[in-house]
Amino acid sequence: MGFVLLPFLKKVIDLELENFVSLLDNIAKSAPLAEQSRRLPDQLVTELRMSGAFRALIPKKFSGLELPFEQYLDIIKRIAEQDASTAWCVNQAAVIATTSLWLPDQIISEIWEDPFASVANGPPYSCNISSDDGGYRLTGHWGFSSGCQHATWMTGPARFSEGGWRSAFFRPDQAQFDDTWHVAGLRATGSFEFRVKDLLVPATQIVNFDDDSTVKNDITTLPTALMFAISFAAVGLGVAKGALSDVIKIAQGKKPQWAALRLREDPDVQRFLGKATARWRSADTYLMHTAAEVIDSVRRNQEISHSQRSQLRMAGTHVIQECAEVVDLAYKISGSTGIYQDELLQRRFQDMHVITQHVQGRESYFGLLGRYAISGDYETGPMT
């Protein structure tokens, strides 16, 4: 049986819905407390749960919103414009949630009929899984688990003793969590490490991505890592747009010490701001056009080509890097105003420079894409 979602994100065809705007306002208001406590506040998590944000990409038959991915990206951008950590947690949960669509129908239903459900994960450090007593025996250590403090399910990949990889789903109370998240940016994601030892996991809670997914649609055709690539780039776009808004407000009233002009009157500031705005618009158009073009093809053909994979990989990485440049320009324009911790632009600066350090933002991918352009041979891997 399903349940009734509060209409924050439900059927968000018009993104100006009053309830969605109210949710965005609450995200912005909650951000300082979230930053201080290094986790999303409970009240905000409850609102996000009931909005359907954590199940935005799950099919309606399993009580999800089943949002088109292009529309989902727009929502992530708008959340990130208010607070990067909230957008990061929502996106991490919503995208990794789609891996549950390889589980049996009964388990998918069990997960998502719970109105409070959300999934957290992390990249593997040392993780092994083997067949045992009709199930699987799992020992592993994973990191960077954004949103794990409010998750109802954990999942993580592990190397299978018989070859390849498997992902296991298990409850948070079956894992040990290590608070290693003492960082400068994206503080409120609370991205702890987690581990299990000799955990017996039922076979029905194990995913083999070499098998066909239980649900077959455009979302399960898109590689999960590449969905993360373009959706984390969407987070970057929201952060960068917010930084531009911040510096415009600063420029309205600031007259730097010993300067002849206010920032808003300074031709250099105007030029830098114009360039930053153009770069943001170019990055936004590039990401959204690439995503729409590839997803439309995947929707029609139920397959993704190497060329399309390369397009998503390139768009995700490039846009993250461009957004950092935009934020840096805004930060430079702000002068000493931008250095204070209570200044919103400072938080965006820190958040953006954590995003660039993420595996999805690595500039080394450009080399892979260049080799593909020259040779026509695409190197598939966990991130490509």
Please annotate each region the language model reported.
Residues D42-M50, F54-A151:
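Glycine-rich flavin
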Residues G185-L186, S191-R281:
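Glycine-rich beta->alpha junctions and the first turn(s) of the following alpha-helix
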Residues S336-T384:
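Glycine-rich phosphate/cofactor-binding loops in nucleotide/flavin-utilizing enzymes
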Residues F144-F177:
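A short core secondary-structure module
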Residues G238, G274-R281, R313, T317-A324, ...:
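Generic structural signal for well-ordered, non-transmembrane alpha-helical segments
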Residues A28, P32-E35, S282-H318, Y331-I339:
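C-terminal helix-coil-helix/basic helical segment that borders enzyme active sites and/or dimer interfaces
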Residues E325-K332, E363-G367:
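Short segments within alpha-helical structural elements
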